[in-house]
Amino acid sequence: MADPKFQNLPGIAYDQPDVYETPDDPETDTSDYYEEEPENEAIERMHISASAAHKRFSGATLEGSVDFTDRIGRRPGRGYDMRGAGEYELVGQGEKETPVQKCQRLQIEMNELLNEVAALQVDRKIADEEKQSYDAVATVISTAKKVLDTLKLEQVLGKEQVPNSKQVKALISQVEEFKQSGVLTAIPTPGTDLASTARVASLEQRLYQLEKTVGAQPEKLSRLNAATNTTNVLEAVRQLSTKAALLQPDKLDTIEQRLTTLAGKMDSIAEKSSGSSQDAKRDQKISELYDIAKRTEPVVEILPHVIERMQALESLHKYANNFAKIIAEIEHKQGTITTSLVNNKELLHSVQETFAQNLETITNKVAKVEQRVTAISTAK
């Protein structure tokens, strides 16, 4: 019933219950069809794997100095500290490597390659030429590894970019030891082929053997060339051997007989000669032919050998021509790399200046913000 104090008031219903219940609505038929929203490129959908995340942070440790906040400061906050005893972690697919990670990965790969080359050098089944090529490859890898050890990442990137880990400290100690030793190594070009390097090493070894056999004194070689009228050492040796063969005792008698016969013929020709102009011209032509025959006599004997030698050296000349082209191409690439390094250095300098200016501007703005926050907190 209604409360007695509400009696005799307009708008009050009497003889009716105080609680009213609305009837239940009939259940509407609902479908299980779910309309998928169209994909939006502005919304990033990240797919995180729990197992991959567990493996990624399985060796992480926390210390008292960690900071996961996003506060603005000169140095970024420290989060998880990945510590490992000489083990390097490779980045995932699609992730960008840091310079330190690249340096560590290259060191590991070079050590593995050196071990493989050393194992191949010890193998007895490999021929000597292949072992020499492996020696040249090992030399190139050792030089590249030394150059990699000389990189000063802390001076180039700054102390904030290079973490203070055991690997980086060991790398810095190796750089200091190499600096104190005073040994300078040439930086190999990135586009150098290992096969061409092996061929260059083989050619250098053959050149050393040739100098050891013939001699590397230019004075003696110039005198030999002047005496034999040729710049080819093999041809000069063949001429000397031919002349020495003519001076043998069994051939001196034959030469003497031929000279005696020739002298008799010359005497008979001189007796039959007359003072006419036709005879004089004929004698002049005969003397010229005789001089030509005398000049070409030693060449006629060695000419077949010279032709055979030239045919044998044809492949070597082609190989030398190809080698000269390769050297010219390497020099061109080296010049291109040098130019790109200069441009990159200038670009790095400009980026550093811009970064320093931006950092100074940000520092000033942060200081102003902190002053304003301090003033507001003081005013409250």
Curated annotation (Swiss-Prot):
Keyword Cytoplasm in record: yes
Membrane topology annotation: Peripheral membrane protein
InterPro entries for the chain: Dynamitin
Record's keyword terms, sorted: Coiled coil, Cytoplasm, Cytoskeleton, Dynein, Membrane, Microtubule
Keyword Ribosomal protein: no
Any Gene Ontology biological process: mitotic spindle organization
Coiled coil: 100-135, 353-377
Segments of skewed composition (Acidic residues): 21-40
Region of interest called Disordered, as start-end residue ranges on this chain: 1-40
Membrane-crossing residue ranges in chain numbering: none
Protein name: Dynactin subunit 2
Naturally occurring in which organism (per UniProt): Drosophila pseudoobscura pseudoobscura (Fruit fly)
